[in-house]
């Protein structure tokens, strides 16, 4: 198994993914009851994930010598576990099944545009903070 040959990377991805998934789950528990048509927990996870991905990429670019294992922990692991394209897809399918086309369009637009905007903000904020 290739992953066994690189145990630190394997463990970093797994640990990061567990932490990210736990945060996503907690956001769902906290925010999904607020508005039942569009689950805010998934939206919050995707927007926060976009923001943190932008900041992480800026950090990675600012520190070329950063450990590849730390990069994997942050991006593939934690942010991969936090962000929720499969959950987003399932929630979109539920809107389709209920014929809620307007909510579906809003759901998709806010997740995609919002995540891209948050990634840009995260990158810009880290770059400005770093100077």
Curated annotation (Swiss-Prot):
UniProt keyword list: Cell inner membrane, Cell membrane, Ion channel, Ion transport, Membrane, Metal-binding, Sodium, Transmembrane, Transmembrane helix, Transport
Domain of life (superkingdom): Bacteria
Q: How does it sit in the membrane?
A: Multi-pass membrane protein
- Alphabetical GO biological process terms: cellular detoxification of fluoride
Q: Name one Pfam family in it.
A: CRCB
Specify where it is mainly localized: membrane
Q: Which GO terms describe its molecular function?
A: fluoride channel activity; metal ion binding
Cellular location of this protein?
Answer: Cell inner membrane
The record's Gene Ontology cellular component field reads: plasma membrane
* Keyword Transmembrane helix applies: yes
Task: Name the reaction it catalyses.
Answer: fluoride(in) = fluoride(out)
Binding annotation for Na(+): 80, 83
**InterPro entries xrefs:** FluC
* Activity regulation statement: Na(+) is not transported, but it plays an essential structural role and its presence is essential for fluoride channel function.
Chain segments annotated as transmembrane: 3-23, 34-54, 62-82, 101-121
Q: Does the keyword Cell inner membrane apply?
A: yes
Job of this protein: Fluoride-specific ion channel. Important for reducing fluoride concentration in the cell, thus reducing its toxicity.
The similarity annotation says: Belongs to the fluoride channel Fluc/FEX (TC 1.A.43) family.
Q: What is this protein called?
A: Fluoride-specific ion channel FluC
């Amino acid at each position: 198994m290739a992953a066994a040959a690189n145990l630190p990377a394997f463990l970093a991805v797994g640990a990061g993914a567990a932490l990210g998934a736990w945060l996503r789950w907690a956001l769902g528990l906290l925010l999904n009851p607020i508005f039942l048509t569009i689950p805010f927990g998934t939206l919050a996870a995707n927007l926060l994930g976009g923001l943190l991905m932008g900041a992480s990429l800026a950090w990675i670019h600012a520190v070329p010598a950063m450990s590849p294992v730390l990069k994997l922990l942050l991006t593939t692991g934690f942010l991969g576990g936090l962000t929720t394209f499969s959950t987003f897809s399932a929630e979109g399918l539920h809107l389709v099944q209920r014929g809620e086309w307007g909510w579906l369009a809003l759901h998709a637009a806010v997740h995609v545009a919002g995540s891209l905007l948050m990634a840009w903000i995260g990158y810009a904020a880290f770059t400005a903070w770093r100077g």
